[in-house]
Amino acid sequence: MKKILPLIVISQFLSTSLWFAGNAVLPDLAKELNLAPEYLGHLTSAVQFGFIAGTLVFAILTIADKFSPSWVFFWSSVLASIFNFAVRLEDISALQILILRFGTGFFLAGIYPVGMKIASDYFKKGLGKSLGFLIGALVLGTAFPHLVRSLLDPLPWKYVIDATSILALIGGFLIVAFVPNGPYRKKSQGFDFTVFFKVFQTKSIRSAAYGYFGHMWELYAFWAFLPFILQYFNSIHSLNLDTAFWSFMIIAVGSISCSVAGLLSGKFSPKSIASFALTVSGICCIISPLLIFQDSQGVLLVFLMVWGLAVTADSPMFSTMVAQNAPESSRGTSLTIVNSVGFAITIVSIQLLNLLSVHINPVYLFLVLGLGPVLGLIGLGFRSRNQALK
């Protein structure tokens, strides 16, 4: 049992490295295919759209609850790797890349939420700690392609695609080979096409979901446009920050806050931790223009590292609240559905920033993200009218 959590965490890290693989090589793709600046938003949204479509299919068919989640994770890793690898094919068009990234996102739906389902099948007590490490692995996996791009900078961008595809395959193999069905797994008895609506009938899940939706408005848009902001900072201050490396560092540091939040969930309520994180990240949104406009790269990087810590710390807490309050027979489906709606929201915020990036001074771009933490805190406040969240 002691080896199970590290195996799940490592597998999650390896397989979710596919998520931002396209973003990490976007500068190279832009030069090779003469892509417009707004392609960044479209590339990120393609993965998110795929993930949403995947989560809807997985949820409606209750795949994670009806079939062995380890095998679901494995086959999803294999198929996501294939779609990811295909991006490196010769004479590929910008549209074809978007379609392939959609396919990668679709099968990521069988990796991220299913990984949480596997963890919840093993750890009834200390679930917050387990999910803290697990989502920390997701964050690190998301950041990892930026590090690979930085380390392999002199080499062709296709090496980044190769590396992430191979890592995802290894992650899937580790799960199916060494992580059997958990002791708390309760198999679903059949397909339930009304499950989407049933999830939000539970007040405790609904409150946690509202907080999560506010969190998601901010998170992926911040991650997606972080390299853009760093490049803009370089241009207005005539600096030469390593955009890929610092994008990795700022995103990856969130894995630490996820893990720490998970450990603290044994002493403090998940709601309290999530509320604190939302408050800090909301403040970061509001003061971001001041920090981007000033010319000290040290000050900016410290600020963005703090933001990187705060923007992710609440994520495992929301997943913990959903998992703890969902019926055992539909826990995986509940997590998948809440994820699906959350990622739908990320598309709106990403495309909004994509639109604004060509119409307003980029210094003010992240102000829009402040709406998420505010609404998230309001959503969590609904708990005061019911005591279901623990």
What are these regions (language model features)?
Residues 269-318:
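C-terminal transmembrane helical hairpin of 12-TM major facilitator-type secondary transporters
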